[in-house]
């Protein structure tokens, strides 16, 4: 305590415990946060099937002070260097100790499945349009979250792997992670890392949003529609209002909300 005293003026923020408990605290904290993420994603997937809006559900449960709004944003699952590693480490530690951590294992399994959700929506959409082979996807976002270039365990990698294996080409842009992406994916024959936000859309068949960068939140929808061959947006971060997107002529798909499409009725 004396060693840390100059750096810990608020005594309530410093807790002294044994080494094993300290290690367990670190793992448990990250697993708790990961659990909240997997939980809201599980709820989002149920919402889609029963006609509920996960955004409304999130606001409702978050209003309960015992739950709060932190870490209950539906999307593409967690990634990066901490949550995946610590969740897996606690699962392994538990099993090595003779205990089956069913809940934590489910958190990991749900997260892995969530990274495939957007890719499946894209595959389903094009299934009735001749399939994915020869199609081009514009991808916004490569990092596992905004404000970093970290692509470890990023959902973008799972989407790229799945769709390119089915014959789709991917043109991607990320404001920060471009250089890292070139090192990871530069030799991939079906992947091109672009230099600017709208470059991937030129001649693409659809747009997918994977990372919630601020610059993706208010794009030029008219420009997007003009550049895309098919006006389809797959929003893995729920950045846009579904009715607004449909009103501008887009087929719009998000997480935990009903798909939206422009009216096909002819005006009189």
Mark where each language-model region is.
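Structural/interface elements that position substrates and couple domains in central-metabolism enzymes
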Residues: 1-268
């Amino acid at each position: 305590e004396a060693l840390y005293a100059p750096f810990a003026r608020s005594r309530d923020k410093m807790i002294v415990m044994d080494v094993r408990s300290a290690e367990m605290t670190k793992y448990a904290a990250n697993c708790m946060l990961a659990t909240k993420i997997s939980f809201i994603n599980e709820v989002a997937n149920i919402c889609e099937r029963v006609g509920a809006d996960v955004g409304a559900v999130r606001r409702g449960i978050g209003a309960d002070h015992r739950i709060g709004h932190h870490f209950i944003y539906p999307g593409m699952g967690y990634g990066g260097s901490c949550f995946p590693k610590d969740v897996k480490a606690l699962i392994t530690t538990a099993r090595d100790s003779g205990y089956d951590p069913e809940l934590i294992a489910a958190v990991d399994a749900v997260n892995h499945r969530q990274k495939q959700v957007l890719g499946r929506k894209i595959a389903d959409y094009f299934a009735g349009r001749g399939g994915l082979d020869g199609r081009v996807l514009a991808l916004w976002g490569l990092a596992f979250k905004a404000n970093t270039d970290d692509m470890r365990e990023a959902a973008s990698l799972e989407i790229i792997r799945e769709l390119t294996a089915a014959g789709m080409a991917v043109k991607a842009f990320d404001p920060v992670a471009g250089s890292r992406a070139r090192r990871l994916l530069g030799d991939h024959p079906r992947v091109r890392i672009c230099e600017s936000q709208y470059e991937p859309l030129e001649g693409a068949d659809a747009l997918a949003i994977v990372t919630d960068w601020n610059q993706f939140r208010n794009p030029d929808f008219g420009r997007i529609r003009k550049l895309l061959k098919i006006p389809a947006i797959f929003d893995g971060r729920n950045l846009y209002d579904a009715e607004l997107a449909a009103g501008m002529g887009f087929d719009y798909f998000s997480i935990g909300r009903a798909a939206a499409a422009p009216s096909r009725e002819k005006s009189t």
